[in-house]
């Protein structure tokens, strides 16, 4: 279901030498007076190549593109965690330039509750996956000509932004036909298409939303329409597809979901959701809103009507682009915004940056089209606009590159300051509390308590796992009830599941509140649920795969029994006929006897 917007900003380091202060863009009270710390780029040794010049050399042409400046305020504790995590990655050569970004590393730390060891393992697996999958070049290498057919059988895509500027992703699960989807493409090709769209979202959509909203955007709002969702939608193919998509998203693009709406949910859906959400973290549950068929007002609270498709209660139809699901509407379709991004027309002022090896704070070294956000923003003056021309190395690329790690990791940076670049180097505008440097670094074991104090980004990496288990359990139960051969088994299994859930719920309610479940416990539960569902699915498949034709021996026995029944029926008919004739004969005899008695009585009277 991601993309930090300052992924192309490389940090630079300041020594114990010169520092420069800039005036604040906002006033602070005496009680809130903070220390302003700034850093400037150090000039490299003459033996090293300074490849990422901040001034355009050679040509004296001036880029008149409007330059916008925004601040990105970093939390002090988060900054310390990210700095330590970053240094650990650099020491093990695990930080490629395109991933050397504050927000990317922060998302991985959030995904592992600020456990540096687990976050590093997750990061290592992600790096290896990108190499094996070819993710870094997938935008250029992979083509997907069957997209129109795929969207017919799996309607999904981005459409517009919410009121906070985040892109809105829509899936109409009730119209998914996995069998036909696999006829027009393959599972492997669809997974590659999914990764390509995710990379496009990170490198194009999120930066465009950031420019349009003038704030940092690296997450999305999702709408899942479950109207018409039935057993036909959740075949084994659909299950394999969902599980693999979920694994890719949660392992390699963590913490990218801001909010999810599940609309047109029926009563059965809501009942099962009430059970499933008891296993989820409260922060995760707070991001998921399960709505019935009266969802329009809730959606319109979060998304403007002009950005919402008409079939969801909005006013947008995208009639000239083949409908809303095919239009890919959003700021990323605005040529001016794309031009501004590609030309480096937006400038990021970092309020707080990485800690160098000597524990000094340093700032960003160059402009980048990705925006870091705070509540304040300023526009560059005319002279600054001339100074802010994008570097030569980036003029031919849609995506500017970072300064290589080797240029700041080898420790060969000269302490001499480049005076000619002083005006181009952004200063740190963060208002920093002096006392925070004296605080102890929280231990890894204190990660959960620390994350609970942050309260900004909830863990959502298991949402798709739980939803997958939820959907499959619901429809597997329906399938079991629909088969007479497995009715008794389904009832017993359903009873046992309800009993287990009831016992667990009672036990949970009876014990005192405990900390949130650990990641390992959640993984064990998910694995157990999916394993049991897999066993049930195999049993159902075995029942479906049994031959409908009866074995020859049993067929002969059945035919013999049928013939015997036919013979018995014939004998019964003959017996009935004989009995009927006997009854007629009996009636005749009784009539004859009665006539003889009457004749005898008449003779006696005549004699008298």
Curated annotation (Swiss-Prot):
Lineage top rank: taxon: Eukaryota
Residue stretches in coiled coil: 526-572
Keyword set, alphabetical order: Cell membrane, Coiled coil, Golgi apparatus, Membrane, Protein transport, Transport
Gene3D superfamilies: CRAL-TRIO lipid binding domain (3.40.525.10), N-terminal domain of phosphatidylinositol transfer protein sec14p (1.10.8.20)
Gene: SFH4
CRAL-TRIO domain residues: 146-320
Function as written in the Swiss-Prot or TrEMBL entry: Required for transport of secretory proteins from the Golgi complex. Catalyzes the transfer of phosphatidylinositol and phosphatidylcholine between membranes in vitro.
Subcellular location: Golgi apparatus membrane; Cell membrane
UniProt GO cellular component terms: Golgi membrane; plasma membrane
Organism encoding this protein: Arabidopsis thaliana (Mouse-ear cress)
Subcellular location, principal: Golgi
UniProt-recorded name of the protein: Phosphatidylinositol/phosphatidylcholine transfer protein SFH4
Annotated InterPro entries: CRAL-TRIO_dom, CRAL-TRIO_dom_sf, CRAL/TRIO_N_dom, CRAL/TRIO_N_dom_sf, PI/PC_transfer
Membrane topology annotation: Peripheral membrane protein
GO biological process: protein transport
Protein transport among keywords: yes
Similarity remark: Belongs to the SFH family.
Keyword Transmembrane helix: no
Region (Disordered): 1-33, 358-403
Lineage: Eukaryota, Viridiplantae, Streptophyta, Embryophyta, Tracheophyta
